[in-house]
């Protein structure tokens, strides 16, 4: 037929058997990619330090999704939460990857079978003997089956009734583990950060899907609606399917970027808004304040801050700091975090405690400014030394560390004080190994950023695809040039394949 590349899909237009075949092959490709990608990530993943080198710092993309659905262990003898295990069971990371690859192979064979045996009786209309699909009936079947799957996931997998549960954590991403979740049927179920809403919404949506599927199986659409929405045209199915996909892509781009119970920070990294709002910093100061009220010393109070919490409060873990065209995991940027140096507290010679202004998300450089508790500028690192009034040397700034590796260590020489003031702009200070991976020191985004960018971009493209195919199916007669003044009556729709010369014409 000599089709251009952008019209090749017309070969399956009136061919239900091969239409099914290419969709099975697509499923094979998706499943095969998922399994292969999982095996690749497992080959390069280092599980040795779940606190300072978690999966999201290493750029893992499919491992977090497996983990949030209840996979914890590897046949390599390690657990995602740290430590070793002896019996990971069949549903380990490798087991899930293998299952996807086996399923991919079966789909591949099924796709070939359906391509070869395309002319099946099931696809023939009994009345005409021609290939046809009862699209409203197929819609009902798919709606019913997806409703069953949705209900089953919410009622069994998430609740732990028959399944592992899902990943659940505290608001600060410290205590995450896989556990069963009870459905939240009250108003709290609509809070995107409440895991119970995942169970209840899947149960409710699944029930609705089952009922809607049964409705569409038992009730035929009215003729006027059938014709008005072009329910007999496969391109209508394409258009509405694209709409469902782009809508879902927009939704998950939002839940990923802004955060939700479905995107735990232990698996995907923190969100940019947690840096912007000082979310972890406030919790750290609250814990230190509680410790001081219990008569602990500054050193004791800061030493009790979990290293994991301090690590979240570091700008290098902000997904908005990495450029879209900086490839690679976060560890390839600022390096592999080795340890927390401790919290630096700066003081001037008059005894004021000074706080370094933190760098906003979208700055690459930022002036080093130290303010007191009232927000008054007391010291800085000046751009022009000749005009400086608040330089570290003039004000006599010193720094002392509390907690971490440098606990109790203080510095008064200006060069060292300025070094740590610059680093304090970026949040809590960590020792970073840039040699192992030859890290270049330029921040990278986390999988949270990549997922959001990819899904938002493709959602936009698919939105245009929905408009395109929706317009094509609604206005097919107009686009085909069939108008009231046409002097040859075309039996339109019998043969739609491009270049087919056999469409019957009858001169009026």
Swiss-Prot record:
Belongs to the PsbB/PsbC family. PsbB subfamily. It is found in: Plastid, Chloroplast thylakoid membrane. The gene is psbB. GO terms for cellular component: chloroplast thylakoid membrane; photosystem II. Its main location: plastid. Keywords: Chlorophyll, Chloroplast, Chromophore, Membrane, Photosynthesis, Photosystem II, Plastid, Thylakoid, Transmembrane, Transmembrane helix. PSII is composed of 1 copy each of membrane proteins PsbA, PsbB, PsbC, PsbD, PsbE, PsbF, PsbH, PsbI, PsbJ, PsbK, PsbL, PsbM, PsbT, PsbX, PsbY, PsbZ, Psb30/Ycf12, at least 3 peripheral proteins of the oxygen-evolving complex and a large number of cofactors. It forms dimeric complexes. NCBIfam families: PS_II_CP47. GO terms for molecular function: chlorophyll binding; electron transporter, transferring electrons within the cyclic electron transport pathway of photosynthesis activity. It is a multi-pass membrane protein. GO terms for biological process: photosynthetic electron transport in photosystem II. HAMAP family: PSII_PsbB_CP47 (MF_01495). Binds multiple chlorophylls. PSII binds additional chlorophylls, carotenoids and specific lipids. This is Photosystem II CP47 reaction center protein. The chain crosses the membrane at residues 21-36, 101-115, 140-156, 203-218, 237-252, 457-472. It comes from Chloranthus spicatus (Chulantree). One of the components of the core complex of photosystem II (PSII). It binds chlorophyll and helps catalyze the primary light-induced photochemical processes of PSII. PSII is a light-driven water:plastoquinone oxidoreductase, using light energy to abstract electrons from H(2)O, generating O(2) and a proton gradient subsequently used for ATP formation.
């Amino acid at each position: 037929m000599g089709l251009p590349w952008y019209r090749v899909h017309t070969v399956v237009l009136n061919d239900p058997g091969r239409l099914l075949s290419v969709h099975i092959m697509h499923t094979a490709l998706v499943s095969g990619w998922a399994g292969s990608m999982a095996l690749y990530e497992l080959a390069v993943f280092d599980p040795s330090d779940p606190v300072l080198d978690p999966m999201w710092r290493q750029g893992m993309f499919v491992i977090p999704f497996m983990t949030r659905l209840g996979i914890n262990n590897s046949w390599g003898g390690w657990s995602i939460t740290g430590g070793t295990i002896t019996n990971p069971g069949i549903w380990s990371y490798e087991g899930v990857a293998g299952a996807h690859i086996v399923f991919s192979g079966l789909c591949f064979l099924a796709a070939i079978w359906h391509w070869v045996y395309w002319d099946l009786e099931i696809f023939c209309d009994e009345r005409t003997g021609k290939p046809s699909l009862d699209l409203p009936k197929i819609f009902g079947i798919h709606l019913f089956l997806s409703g069953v799957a949705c209900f089953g996931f919410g009622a069994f997998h998430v609740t732990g009734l028959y399944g592992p549960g899902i990943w659940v954590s505290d608001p600060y991403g410290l205590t995450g583990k896989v556990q069963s979740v009870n459905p939240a049927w009250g108003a709290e179920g609509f809070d995107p950060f409440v895991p119970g809403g995942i169970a209840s919404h899947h149960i409710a949506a699944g029930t609705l899907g089952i009922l809607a599927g049964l409705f569409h199986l038992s009730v035929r659409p009215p003729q006027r609606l059938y014709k008005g929405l072009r329910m007999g045209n496969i391109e209508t199915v394409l258009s509405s399917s694209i709409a469902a996909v782009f809508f879902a892509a927009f939704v998950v781009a939002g839940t990923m970027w802004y955060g939700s119970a479905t995107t735990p920070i232990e698996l995907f990294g923190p969100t940019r808004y947690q840096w912007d709002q000082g979310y972890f910093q406030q919790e750290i100061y609250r814990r230190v304040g509680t410790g001081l009220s219990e008569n602990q010393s500054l050193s004791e109070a800061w030493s009790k801050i979990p290293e994991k919490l301090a690590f979240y409060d570091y700008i290098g873990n902000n997904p908005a700091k990495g450029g879209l065209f900086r490839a690679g995991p976060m560890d390839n940027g600022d390096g592999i975090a080795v340890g927390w140096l401790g919290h630096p507290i700066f003081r001037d010679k008059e005894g004021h405690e000074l706080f370094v202004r933190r760098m906003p998300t979208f700055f690459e450089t930022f002036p080093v400014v130290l303010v007191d508790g009232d927000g008054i500028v007391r010291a800085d690192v000046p751009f022009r030394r000749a005009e400086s009034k608040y330089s570290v040397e003039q004000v006599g700034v010193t720094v002392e560390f509390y907690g971490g590796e440098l606990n109790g260590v203080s510095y008064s020489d200006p060069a060292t004080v300025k070094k740590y003031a610059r680093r304090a702009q970026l949040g809590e200070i960590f020792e970073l190994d840039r040699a192992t991976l030859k890290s270049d020191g330029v921040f990278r985004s986390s999988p949270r950023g990549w997922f959001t960018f990819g899904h938002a971009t493709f959602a936009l493209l698919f939105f245009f695809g929905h408009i395109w195919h929706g317009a094509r199916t609604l206005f097919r007669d107009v686009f085909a040039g069939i108008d009231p003044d046409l002097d040859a009556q075309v039996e339109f729709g019998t043969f739609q394949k491009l270049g087919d010369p056999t469409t019957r014409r009858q001169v009026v």
